[in-house]
Amino acid sequence: MRVKIPRWEIAVICSALLFPGTSLSAQEVGQEEKEVKEMRQDVEQLQQDVRQLREEVRRLQEEIHGFRHNSFPQCGADTVAPYVPHHFIHRLGIEARPQYVFPTNPFLQGENERWKPIQSSFAAHLKYSFKFRPNTCADRIYGGAYQGFGLAFTTFGDKKQLGDPMTFYVFQGVRIARFNPRLSLNYEWNFGISAGWKPYDNDYNSYNGAVGSRVNAYLNAGIYLNWSLSRYFDFIIGGDFTHFSNGNTKFPNAGVNTTGAKIGLVYNFNREESDLTKSLVKPYIPRFPRHISYDLVLFGSWRRKGVYVESGKQIASPGSYPVAGFNFAPMYNLNYKLRFGVSLDGVYDGSANVYTEDRIVEYDYDGGSGTSGRRFLVPGIQHQLALGLSGRAEYVMPFFTINVGLGTNVLGRGDLRGLYQVFALKINVTRSSFLHIGYNLQDFQTPNYLMLGLGFRFNNKYPKVRH
């Protein structure tokens, strides 16, 4: 852009050069220089504003071109806008998580080899993630969603009795609220497996009533503040809750629960300065086609069972029992992020209504669970089948869907009566199939069984959202 200087200023400058004796006083010259300097700053600012405006106009032209040809550059089916350098922003983060351990069982309360309560833990995390670029269609729909995988090392200060587990997990986070372009409130969940525990052993670790297996599931959820320090670095601080358990696949299964703080630093490899500014143009979001889809899930797992005896105590069954089932759920797709529906749930639980004889008989089992000398009897299959109805709700995000359900068995005997609750994570494999990892509770407190399986979605009209 050319800078226009008035003719009278040019004449004054020329006269000062040609006729020094008639030049302006030093004070007047200083004032003129100050005005020229301010004018140059104004011109530079104007040039910068014009460049930003041109960039916004170019983005708008790309979107208008997409509307005319039914192909949206940031929100359509086939193309990606040429001005976007990469589809995602790639990130690497580190976190420190000091935690408080809930004293949920006697072992953690102090009934252990050292006769000291286990009250704290510390975890160090290394995480890779990728997120949608700001001011894209996916960013607007899903609230700046990011996802990835992480590796964590956790110590409880008692390696001999509890171990120092390593955890591998997937995670996803979403913006809850944005206070300004650099500061936001986010939530994040983690789900994975942890290995390296020291489980219960009747001979070598008999006090440990919290953990019964070397490998346990890992669940974590928390909220935090994200502050963008610069183009490359983000600082995070917040709190979270963590649960470790084996999903009732082995006894004991009291689990370990912790809560505490999370503090970390995130490096953004390919974030641009423009990603930290508020855009004047917002991408167009196509109207969501409301419809009914149908989810069919087939699952299976195994479980241990605690059986009450005549003394009123509960003892562990001598082995594991198979579990298999299905869910068929018509789901009403309300918008990009919510589904509601009703599910028909069938299950075969090989541990249902298992009982022991009142008398003690010869039974050779050495599992360290107090089951020696008792015979566990399995009833007929009619006592191990159930059919129920549950209400379902789903929170839909890129790559992952969180499913919750509340239902009751309309057909079932004994142990299979009553309310049940379902919590599941669906991981997209293709547009019409997904992995299903879930858990079933009874009456909001009693652990039931894992639900590991494969799902299929029919009549899926969910729009393809480009990133």
Regions found by a protein language model. Give the residues of each.
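Outer-envelope beta-barrel architecture signal
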Residues: 86-92, 141-147, 181-187, 231-235, ...
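Residues that define the transmembrane beta-barrel architecture of outer-membrane proteins
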Residues: 88, 118-124, 162-168, 183, ...
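Residues on the lipid-exposed face of transmembrane beta-strands in outer-membrane beta-barrel proteins
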Residues: 94, 124-130, 170-176, 189-193, ...
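Transmembrane beta-strands of outer-membrane beta-barrel pores
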Residues: 96-102, 130, 151-157, 191-199, ...
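Surface-exposed strand-loop-strand hairpins of Gram-negative outer-membrane beta-barrel proteins
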Residues: 101-123, 161-162, 304-327
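Repeated loop/turn-to-beta-strand initiation elements of outer-membrane beta-barrel proteins
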Residues: 102, 135-137, 227, 231-235, ...
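Gram-negative (and chloroplast) outer-membrane scaffold detector with strong preference
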Residues: 142-195, 329, 334-410, 427-429, ...
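Outer-membrane beta-barrel "beta-signal"
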Residues: 257-278, 447-467
